[in-house]
Amino acid sequence: MTLNLKNFFNPKIKMSKMGEFQELKPISGLEISSVSADLYNDGRDDISLFYFKDGANFAAVYTTSRITSASINWNLKIKRHFVKALMVNTKNANTFTGIKGAQGLKEIAHTLSKSLTLKSSQTTEGAKDIIKITDLLFASTGVIGEEFPHIKIKNRIPELVKKLRVEQNKFVWFKTASAIMTTDIRPKLAYEECKIGNKLVKISGIAKGSGMIAPNMATMLSFIFTDANIPSVFLKAILKKVIATTFNSITVDSDTSTNDMVAIFSTGKVKNSKIYNILDPKLQDFEKALHRLSLNLAKQIVVDGEGAKKFVTINVVGATSLSAAKNIGFSVANSPLFKTAIAGEDPNWGRIVMAIGKSGENIVANKIQIKIGDFIVAEQNAVAKEYDEEKLREYMKWGSINIEINLNLGKSSY
C-alpha cells in the first residue's frame, strides 16, 4: 500500500483561546497534590494524587482501543465501585511496556497503599485505615513504548502523599491540572453547581488532551469530582449518557489512544436525599450540570489541538484476511498523529501501535512486530531489544520511508 502523505496535510487553522481560567471550588472529602518525579528532566510537576480520606463512589469509561495501557488494565480489574485514591503520571503512557510495565505499576501501588495507610494512622483520631492496592486507581499519559520509570515515580510517593491538601484553591487546581498535561498548551478546568433536592452540590473537573482526540475519546484524561452522594451504578449511567454527547462527539485528529479515561468520583459529603432510581427527578439537574461541565472541558480540548511531508509505503502482513490487513494499513496511514511523526522526522513508533489498536480488527499484542526501514522497533508487546533510536532517527530523515506491520496471525497481506 503506497500513499503520498502530502495529500493529507492542510494548513493548521489557528483558533482563539478560550476565556480566563474558571475558578474551581474545594470538594469536601477530596485532597489533592502534585510533585515532580523529574520525568521530563526539567523539574515540572508530572505526578499527581487525588485522595479520598473516607472513600468515594466512582464510575469510569475507558478507551475503545484494543491495545491498552497497564493503568487501564489495572483499573479494569478493580471490581469495587468505592475507592480511596487516584494517581496520575504524565510523560510515559506505560503502554506496550510488557510485563515490566505491569510489575512496575504494581510496585507503585504497594508503595502508595503503604504511604496512605501511614498517613491515615497519623490522624488526630489515631484510627488506622488500611488502604489496599485494590482501593487505588491509576492513569498514565505520554509516550507509548518507552520503559516505564516506576522507580522514579515510586521514590516520590512519600512526598506526594505529604503534600496532600484538603483546601483546593485556584492555584492548587491549576497546578494539578498542569501536572497531567503532555503536549497540551494549557490546563483545562471547569466547575458547576446544582441542587439535588434542597442540597447544593459542587462539581469540579480537569482534563488533558491535545493529540489523539477523536470520537470514542482519545489521548484524553478527564477527572471529575463531586461532593454529592450518588451511588456508583447511577454515576455510571449518567456518565455514559453525558459522554456520548460531549467527549465522544469531538475530534481533533481522528486518533483513539490507548490510555483514554474519563472518571467521576462522588465523596458523598453533601447529605442529599437518597437516590433509589436512575429516573429520579432529583438527578436531572445533576445530569445537566455534569453535561455542561463535560462539554466545557471537551471544547477546551478541541481548542488545544496538535499538528505535518514524505512518501511512505506501509505493508501489513500476517493478517487473518485481506480486509483486516487493509483496514489496519489505512488506520495507520490516515492517522494524523502518525503523519505528524513522519513529517517531523520523529521515530515515535508508539503512534503506529496506537493506530493498529484503534483499527477495530482482532489482534494479539504479543504477536505484533513493527519494522521501520530495516529496523525492528517493537515485538512481543514491548520495544525490541535491538532498538536503536539514533539510527532510526537518521532513517526518518529520508524522503521515502518503508513500514512493515506483521500481525503474525495469518497469511493475508496488503
Where do the PLM segments sit?
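A structural signal for small-residue-enriched, beta-sheet-centric alpha/beta enzyme cores
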Residues: 2-107, 111-119, 131-414
